[in-house]
Amino acid sequence: MIKQYLQVTKPGIIFGNLISVIGGFLLASKGVIDYPLFISTLLGVSLVVASGCVFNNYIDRDIDRIMERTKNRVLVKGLIDPKISLIYASILGIAGIVLLYAAANALAMQLAIIGFVVYVGVYSLYMKRKSVYGTLIGSLSGAAPPVIGYCAVTGQFDTGALILLLIFSLWQMPHSYAIAIFRFKDYQAANIPVLPVIKGISVAKNHIILYILAFMIATLMLAISGYAGYKYLVVAAAVSVWWLGMALSGYKTDNDRIWARKLFIFSIVAITSLSVMMSIDPHVPSEAFLTYVR
């Protein structure tokens, strides 16, 4: 039973989000780490993300039955009572929000609530099923964890937080489109209006290129604005150029599914590399680059 309650929280998604939280937190810490705050932030974000995933599993039960990759999820197979899952999700979410408020600050809590509402209330309940722009809306919630980590330290939404929001939002788009391409039949069968299904894979490839170019600019801005150092800059430039090259190769591929899967895998390598480098190579920016929103 414990295994099912763990699975419904999507541990893989929680782990991926924690890597970005660590990146944002350590970037803001500038080498001076408040360990109790660090642990509390990781736990708080984990609980909120877990809550969102459980709610998402509850909402998506009907379409999860249709899709090959989701047909064996806990709620689809009836291993947990749906009503119990709602209570479970609520407890997780409330615990995470309270912890962020008590151990971090009100801004971190507010960002967590906004990310949660966008993911569950806007994306999962409506946009995912009704609009080709659902991925764009979902990308905003996906970018919340690193910003929460950053603001847990700073207590303010400044230029650094804005750049992090841009980096992780822009990264989500080609990452998600790649999934939609190599899982094309799943999304088509479930009538989920993702861009590759609605506009075609060729159009999706064009969008992927544009988003990676924008992602590249955003990643470099973190160093140009003085928030990260030259080591970060070199890695950011390298992974962005490589990712762009992989995306461009999609115009010549004979197998879109294999190409998209490779692009998806490298997207994880890219964002993990950036999270690591911003963690170990932070800089203190000039005041000229700071825009405070307290």
From Swiss-Prot:
InterPro entries hit by this protein: Protohaem_IX_farnesylTrfase (IPR006369), UbiA_prenyltransferase (IPR000537), UbiA_prenylTrfase_CS (IPR030470), UbiA_sf (IPR044878)
BP GO annotations: heme O biosynthetic process
Cellular location(s): Cell inner membrane
GO cellular component: plasma membrane
CDD domains according to UniProt: PT_UbiA_Cox10
Enzyme class: transferase
Major location category of this protein: membrane
TM ranges: 13-33, 35-55, 84-104, 107-127, 132-152, 162-182, 208-228, 229-249, 264-284
Alphabetized GO MF terms: protoheme IX farnesyltransferase activity
Keywords: Cell inner membrane, Cell membrane, Heme biosynthesis, Membrane, Transferase, Transmembrane, Transmembrane helix
Family: Belongs to the UbiA prenyltransferase family. Protoheme IX farnesyltransferase subfamily.
Cross-referenced HAMAP family: CyoE_CtaB
Note: Carbon 2 of the heme B porphyrin ring is defined according to the Fischer nomenclature.
Name assigned to this protein: Protoheme IX farnesyltransferase
